[in-house]
A protein has these predicted regions:
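Conserved Nudix-box catalytic region and its N-terminal flanking loop in Nudix hydrolases
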Residues: 23-35, 44-88
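Nudix hydrolase/Nudix homology domain
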Residues: 102-178
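A sequence-level detector of short linear motifs
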Residues: 15-18, 50, 177
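Residues that flank catalytic or metal-binding motifs in active/ligand-binding sites
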Residues: 4, 32-34, 68, 100, ...
Length: 178
């Protein structure tokens, strides 16, 4: 597999160079990522989509995550982030369809892994059905939607469970609806 090269930044968001993804996370360099929250509104109810990260992922395996998210490579700009949508979900979206929400600084340290992200965050108002999605199995093992207000209550710990609707891919590549 080819080494992914990422732009690295200082604490003022000024690019200072380029480094491998491994070095970026080992040394804790600030780097750019693309996050796109899929949302929909159905019968007056707002939903937020989440993807289930593949259990084989090196970073944050088997967790629910933003739909989709990924590193911006050294030769890419934020406009190229839409490739993550196509790669992970099989949906063609143009950058003009995205609503910019800002750049969020995110920092997490685990043993041997320092993740310092400058997350370029966007919203996509989706009219797609679950049948429209083709998941990239190396990255994503499932896709669900949750009522937005329920998700907010889960996030703020007002609830400890929420109802989700969507699917997981089984080991044979078939969709298992929930």
């Amino acid at each position: 597999m080819e080494t992914e090269l990422l732009k690295v930044f200082d604490s003022n968001r000024i690019q200072t160079g380029v480094a491998s993804r491994e070095e970026v996370h080992r040394l804790g360099h600030w780097h750019e990522v693309f996050h796109c929250w899929f949302a929909s509104s159905e019968a007056g109810v707002d939903y937020l989509y989440l993807q289930h990260r593949c259990a084989m992922k090196k970073d944050y395996p088997n967790l629910w995550d933003i739909t989709p998210a990924g590193h911006l490579l050294a030769h890419e700009t934020v406009y190229d982030g839409v490739r993550e949508i196509k790669e992970e979900l099989g949906i063609d979206v143009s950058f003009d369809e995205l609503v910019p929400l800002g750049i969020i600084e995110y920092h997490q340290t685990k043993e041997g892994f320092i993740d310092k992200e400058l997350a370029n965050v966007f919203l996509y108002e989706s009219a797609h059905s679950f049948d429209d999605f083709t998941l990239q199995p190396e990255e994503v093992s499932g896709l669900v939607k949750v009522v937005l207000t329920d998700f907010e209550e889960l996030w703020t710990e007002a609830k400890d469970k929420v109802y989700i609707k969507g699917f997981e891919m089984n080991h044979e590549g078939r969709r298992m609806m929930n």
